[in-house]
Design a protein with these regions (language model features):
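Acidic-basic catalytic patches of nuclease active cores, encompassing PD-(D/E)XK
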Residues: 1-36, 73-78, 85-155, 203
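Conserved catalytic cores of phosphodiester-cleaving nucleases, focusing on short active-site segments
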Residues: 11-14, 18-21, 25-65, 157-161, ...
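Short, charged, amphipathic alpha-helix that recurs within catalytic cores of restriction-modification
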Residues: 54-83, 183-203
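Intrinsically disordered, charged low-complexity linkers and terminal tails
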Residues: 54-59, 145-147, 154-156, 217-218
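Nucleic-acid nuclease catalytic cores
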Residues: 70-96, 198-227
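Short, electropositive alpha-helical surface patch
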Residues: 100-110, 221-246
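An interfacial alpha-helical scaffold signature
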Residues: 106, 165, 183-185
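Charged phosphate-binding loop/patch that engages nucleotide di/tri-phosphates or the phosphate backbone
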Residues: 244-254
C-alpha cells in the first residue's frame, strides 16, 4: 500500500535535479521522537516494504536517508533505529529493527514498544499483537499512535539542505494550506513539533526553517510560485520570525 508520496516542491526539485535538497518519499519516513517537552530522544528511519524487500540490502535511497540521520545522530548524541515493516500485508504482527544500521532482528510489536521504552519514551499499555495497514495510515503509524501514548512529540523531516560536501545545514518543515502567502503564520498548536525539530538542529549545528506555499483543494492546486520562509530559533523572542518570500527559482538556488 502506498501513502503520501510527493508534492509540487518535491517534483520541482526532482525535475530540475537540484543537488542540495534531499528528502524521502513514498513509504519512507525520517522521524524524530521526543518527550512532552519536545526534547529529542530518538531518531528513526522507518520504511514500509514488500515481501522481496523485507530482508534485502539497503537501497541507494535508504543509504542516503540513513546517512543524513546518522550525521545528526552522531552530532546530537541521539540513538538511531532503522525499522522495516511489511506494507503489502493487510496487518502486521512484527517488524525488523536495527540498532546499529547493520544487523536486523525480528521483533513483535510488543517488543518494539519495549525498545522505545528503553530510550525513555512513554509507552501505553495498549495491546500490541497486530496493526492494520489501511488507506489513510500505515500499520507502523497506527502502532505509534496507539502505543506511544500522549506524552511524546514526534515529527518527520520534510526537507534537508546540504552543502557541497553533502553535510546537512538546514532542515525545512513544509507547510501548505489555503491561506494566502501574506496571511499565513505558523499555528501555535504546531509549536511543540517545531521546537522538537529545532532542538535536534540546535544540537547538530544546523538551522531550522519553515517553508510555506499555498495549496487549494477545489480546484486542487499546489502553488509553489512563491514560498514564504520563516526562521525558527527558540533561544530568541519571538522564536519564529518571518524571513523572506522566494520565487520558486530563487528557492531552488537558495
Amino acid at each position: 500500500m502506498k501513502y503520501y508520496t510527493t508534492n509540487a516542491l518535491y517534483e520541482q526539485i526532482i525535475s530540475r535535479r537540484i543537488p542540495h535538497y534531499k528528502f524521502t518519499t513514498g513509504n519512507s519516513w525520517q522521524l524524530i521522537y521526543g518527550d512532552k517537552n519536545s526534547t529529542p530522544l530518538l531518531l528513526v528511519y522507518a520504511k514500509g516494504v514488500n515481501e522481496t524487500e523485507y530482508f534485502s540490502d539497503y537501497s541507494q535511497q535508504d543509504q542516503k536517508a540513513i546517512g543524513l540521520l546518522s550525521f545528526v545522530s552522531k552530532h546530537s548524541s541521539l540513538p538511531l533505529l532503522i525499522i522495516r515493516f511489511r506494507a503489502d500485508l493487510n496487518e502486521i504482527k512484527e517488524v525488523l529493527v536495527s540498532e546499529n544500521s547493520l544487523d536486523f532482528k525480528r521483533v513483535s510489536l510488543a517488543q518494539l514498544s519495549d525498545i522505545f521504552k528503553k530510550y525513555d519514551l512513554p509507552v501505553s499499555n495498549t495491546p500490541t499483537d497486530k496493526y492494520l495497514n489501511d488507506k489513510s495510515s500505515s500499520a507502523y503509524h497506527n502502532w505509534q499512535r496507539s502505543c506511544l501514548g500522549r506524552g511524546i512529540t514526534v515529527s518527520d523531516i520534510d526537507l534537508w539542505k546540504v552543502d557541497s560536501k553533502g553535510i546537512p545545514r538546514v532542515i525545512f518543515e513544509l507547510k501548505r494550506s489555503y491561506y494566502t502567502i501574506e496571511r499565513w503564520r505558523p499555528f501555535p498548536e504546531d509549536y511543540n513539533n517545531f521546537k522538537l525539530v529545532w532542538s535536534l538542529c540546535y544540537k547538530s549545528n544546523m538551522l531550522f526553517k519553515i517553508a510555506y506555499n499555498v495549496r487549494t483543494k477545489n480546484p486542487f492546486f499546489d502553488d509553489i510560485s512563491r514560498i514564504k520562509i520563516f526562521s525558527v530559533d527558540f533561544t530568541k523572542n519571538p522564536s519564529i520570525a518571518e524571513e523572506t518570500v522566494f520565487s520558486i527559482n530563487d528557492f531552488m538556488n537558495y
